[in-house]
Every structure is written in C-alpha cells, then in structure tokens.
Amino acid sequence: MSQIKPSRLSSSAEIRGARQLDVLQRHKLAEPQQDWLAEEVPVALVYNGISHVVMMATPKDLAAFALGFSLSEGIISSPQEIYAIEITPGCNGIEVNIELSSRRFAGLKERRRAMAGRTGCGVCGIEQLDDIFRPITPLPFTQAFNLEHLDTALAQLKQVQPVGQLTGCTHAAAWINPEGELLGGCEDVGRHVALDKLLGIRAKQPWQQGAVLVSSRASYEMVQKTAMCGAEILFAVSAATTLAVEVAERCNLTLVGFSKPGRATVYTHPQRIK
C-alpha cells in the first residue's frame, strides 16, 4: 500500500496541488502578473477494477483520501482490508486503484446493487428520514477537551494549508491532541475530501486522544464521516446545520461550531468539553 504520512508545511517550491498562472490584477492600475491557483482534478476511486465514484479533489495525499473515504463510507472497517493502493495519473484526471479484500468487495457490490436506480444528488431517492443516517455504533465517552487549548489549535491550522496560504482556496482538516497541539492534517478544495484525507492519515497513526478540527462548516456528512472513524469530538470553524446536530446527537458525537479564538458553540454532548 502507498505510504501515508502526516502533512506538514512545505516551502513554496515544494507545493503540490497549486500552479502559477498569468493573470491581470487591478488595483489602481491593471498590471499583468503571476498568481497561484489551487488545482482541482477529477479523481476516480476504483475498487478491484470497478469505478465506484469520481470526486473533484486537489491532487495530493490521494492514498490517504482513498483510505479515509473507504473507512468513512463504511466500505471497510480496518485499514488491513485494503491490500494495495495505486495512483495512476491520466489525461482527464487521476485513477486511484484500491485492492479490497474479497469479503469487503462482495459487500461493496451488494451495496451498489441496492443503490441502483438512485440519482447521484446526495439524498435524492431516499424515501424516509431514517434512511439518510448510516448505521453508526454510538460512540463511547472516553475523550475530553479543555476549550482553553482551542486557541492553540486554531493558531496552527494554517500549517497544514500550504496551498491554501498561496491561493486562499482550500479547506483544512486536522487532528489535535487534548493540549491543542496539531499532530497532522490535510487540505483540499473540497471540505469532505480534506476530512477523508485526515481520517486516512489518522488510521495509520497512533492518534487516539484528541479531536477533529475543520476549517469549514459542519454538515451531516462531516459528522457521519467523523463518527464512522471513531472520533468523538468535531470542531468546525463555521456553523453546523440542523441535520448535523441531529446526527451528532444520535451517535454521541460532541459537535462544536463557530470555533474561533475566544469563542465556541457546543451543540451536542457537552460533557466532553471542559
């Protein structure tokens, strides 16, 4: 399997996922110059030779994305159920070929048959509210976080956004320990993809105590993905949706929105927050 390492800040000469283009800047006078733009490419996740989904993503940390997506979508329950990940760039995008165990591949094929005929716009085709929620084992209450350390974590978030610092165009997802230290993280033009990348990296690291911190809002998908991977606390820099709060309540996840210096809004299960 491709090696997965925590992302850290790189020099601009080493930046992957961004390109310089000629632009016309207007301040007082219009002047031609170069500017950095974040890359966005189609990325196909292919399981045992069958294309499962195509996502728009920043082309970095794609092995981590494949592992995190597989875990957060319930395709696998352990990294050991993926035997290999191979990344193949092409003319129209990137293929990430994932070799699944035979048992998990059989489960994926059955799941694809059950979804046949549904449209591809999220919850379209679902007949009742309960069908929206992926079966998630309620999380235990083993974690705690002191909000005094949140400012420390927020101050470090840009460390995992080298492309974002150049372009202003990426979301970040990071793992922070109970002292607010940022242990690692990822960025992407898509907030869900950034989170999947982080969850893939975390699956290969001994990070148990701590929480997820994302630079975006918290949608119900973000909550489900976090809970599916066993993380008990999710901090979002922006707001949470009503459905995100409902899902968090159901699966025992502590959801915190408006995570900014000196403030935070705890929506669910505040017993983990000090």
UniProtKB/Swiss-Prot annotation:
What job does this protein perform? Required for formate dehydrogenase (FDH) activity. Acts as a sulfur carrier protein that transfers sulfur from IscS to the molybdenum cofactor prior to its insertion into FDH.
What stretch or stretches form a coiled coil here? none
Task: Return the InterPro entries for the record.
Answer: Cytidine_deaminase-like, FdhD
Per the record, its GO cellular-component terms are: cytoplasm
Where is the protein situated, by its record's location annotation?
Answer: Cytoplasm
| Predominant localisation class | cytoplasm
Q: What is this protein called?
A: Sulfur carrier protein FdhD
